A protein has these predicted regions:
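N-terminal segments that cap or nucleate solenoid repeat domains
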Residues: 1-29
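Basic, Lys/Arg-rich alpha-helical nucleic-acid-recognition elements, primarily the DNA-binding modules
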Residues: 22, 35, 53
Length: 260
């Protein structure tokens, strides 16, 4: 373990073997950091925060600060971060409120680029890429392998499905289903632009799976006006497979509505 002499690390914090803490970083009382995680200079980690192993946390990151929520009264809510994440400069990850599960969660192997904001009660899966200045409102859920380009702004309580791709400067007021591409023009609300076929191929999806999802997309977004009708047709016309079930369940469970 290496702690720079200018860093301020609480004697109550739990740092395991191989952790490095750079100049002028501050680690609070209730922080746990797993082995071989590197904390660069000028990082602040506070609150009830647990960080896993082999994370790379760059200068001026803030993790575990209070939620930007007027109802928060200092309760002991948490931030949980997995393993092997890269968290670049000026990223902010706020602790949760008491309105849900008391936890803001970031999974493993994610890449959060500069100035990304992860608000209170967000839940991020694994292997997500969030480009510079992408912003998540509170209670947002982001699925595995999703890509959010620069300056994407996501409304609170929105869900982003696994393997979705969102183009830059896009406002996201409604749920983005798994496996699709979405974009808006210069800050406009998102619209869907088909299946994320390149991403699916890169991640090893079979031709049969991609073709089945393409057929489902065509029925749901081009041939039917109501999702209830589209789901019925898809179930009647396409042999079920796990990715198709994931897509249909995501649509059926939506509370904010589905992007078209």
């Amino acid at each position: 373990m290496e702690i720079h002499h200018t860093a301020v690390v609480s004697p109550h914090a739990q740092l395991t073997s191989g952790v490095k803490v750079g100049p002028y970083s501050i680690i609070g009382d209730n922080v746990t950091i797993g082995r071989d995680t590197v904390i660069h200079s000028h990082v602040v980690i506070d609150g009830h925060t647990r960080i896993g192993e082999r994370n790379d946390i760059c200068p001026f990151v803030s993790i575990g600060s209070p939620p930007q929520d007027l109802g928060y009264k200092g309760e002991d809510t948490r931030v949980l971060i997995g393993d092997d994440n890269i968290i670049r400069e000026y990223v902010t990850i706020n602790r949760a409120t008491t309105k849900q599960d008391w936890e803001t969660i970031v999974g493993s192997e994610n890449y959060l680029m500069a100035y990304v904001h992860v608000a209170h009660d967000c839940v991020l899966g694994n292997k997500i890429i969030m480009s510079n200045v992408a912003t998540l409102g509170g209670h947002t859920i982001v699925g595995d392998y999703a890509i959010l380009s620069g300056l994407v702004a996501v409304h609170q309580f929105v869900r982003i499905g696994a393997h979705a791709f969102i183009g830059g400067k896009t406002a996201i007021p409604k749920d983005i289903p798994p496996f699709v591409m979405a974009a808006g023009a210069e800050g406009a609300r998102a619209k869907l632009f088909g299946l994320n076929q390149n991403g699916l191929r890169r991640h090893g999806f079979s031709r049969e799976t991609i073709n089945g999802l393409k057929k489902a997309y065509k029925i749901l977004w081009r041939e039917t006006g109501r999702f209830s009708e589209g789901i019925r047709r898809v179930r009647e016309e396409i042999e079920p497979f796990s990715e198709l079930d994931m897509l249909l369940d995501f649509i059926s469970e939506s509370k904010r509505g589905i992007t078209r």
